UniProtKB/Swiss-Prot annotation:
Free-text remark on how the cofactor is bound: The D1/D2 heterodimer binds P680, chlorophylls that are the primary electron donor of PSII, and subsequent electron acceptors. It shares a non-heme iron and each subunit binds pheophytin, quinone, additional chlorophylls, carotenoids and lipids. D1 provides most of the ligands for the Mn4-Ca-O5 cluster of the oxygen-evolving complex (OEC). There is also a Cl(-1) ion associated with D1 and D2, which is required for oxygen evolution. The PSII complex binds additional chlorophylls, carotenoids and specific lipids.
Organism in which the protein naturally occurs: Rhodomonas salina (Cryptomonas salina)
Binding-site list for a quinone: 215, 264-265
Membrane topology type: Multi-pass membrane protein
Gene3D superfamilies xrefs: Photosystem II protein D1-like
Cysteines paired by S-S bonds: none
Site (Cleavage): 344-345
Record's GO cellular component terms: chloroplast thylakoid membrane; photosystem II
Protein name: Photosystem II protein D1
Pfam families: Photo_RC
PROSITE patterns: REACTION_CENTER
Similarity-based family: Belongs to the reaction center PufL/M/PsbA/D family.
Amino acid sequence: MTATLERRESASLWERFCSWITSTDNRLYIGWFGVLMIPTLLTATTVYIIAFIAAPPVDIDGIREPVAGSLLYGNNIITGAVIPSSASIGIHFYPIWEAASLDEWLYNGGPYQLIVDHFLLGVCGWIGREWEFSYRLGMRPWISVAFTAPVAAASAVFLVYPIGQGSFSDGMPLGISGTFNFMLVFQAEHNILMHPFHQLGVAGVFGGSLFSAMHGSLVTSSLIRETTENESANYGYKFGQEEETYNIVAAHGYFGRLIFQYASFNNSRALHFFLGLWPVVGIWFTALGIMTMAFNLNGFNFNQSVVDSQGRVINTWADILNRANLGMEVMHERNAHNFPLDLAAGESLPVALTAPAVNG
């Protein structure tokens, strides 16, 4: 009997690279979507840090009045921001090679587009990487589905809203006070507080926080003790164990008696599906609301909707909100030639019954 030994052909460099990229044994899973995610997020992060520290002022309104947003130009952590691209650029794609010089690119807010575009590509790559990793481990894809909610929200404020408004200068500035400024201006121009999709988003975020706190406290309070009184309860568990960690029957009974019977779940799958579904759907609706308001399908307007028998207006909270919106709009549009149309086109509202006497 003759035995023949053959040398095994070594895998090519490409095959070894593919095996390494898709290996679930790596300390951090990379995956093919990670090949897209890693360079784009690194680019966005690097440019953001540099721009936040040292970017020169940007002509955001396209009227030769640059606005400084970086730390080296007098801002602090709270007031600093990466200023959106100039209104003179509109929604045109504005990479570095489209500008006549680097100074012109910086003056027109080119870093904002570079950061936003790479960031959105990166977070989409993160979604794909979550799905890919789950697939290779034999898990179901709901982790990546849940992450579509924040990605939809980011896409709404950084991409869809500027496109709908006709300029990337209307996008959300990349900073703390810039975010609040964006929120105030958005309310002034679109009355988002009166939009049902935003209200669903508020219910999703605050409701999700409440349900998460309730669930965590109930689980922690109903752990099954596997140790003695002299040992920490944490020593009685190991990651991936088959046995239940907590007593869902006890938690269900406690909560059912605290409120009422049908307010609690006695099925762990249904409970956790609900905990994941509630905030995700709420944020989906908020993102959808931003996208509809991007094209000026705004919140409800109930201004001057209540009148008495003589036809005189009885002011409601909607009218107070409208007055606040007009005030925020005036503060936002600080140039006379940009005077808000909703103020310029309507009848003048008296703010004083008599003119003040001026002594001088």
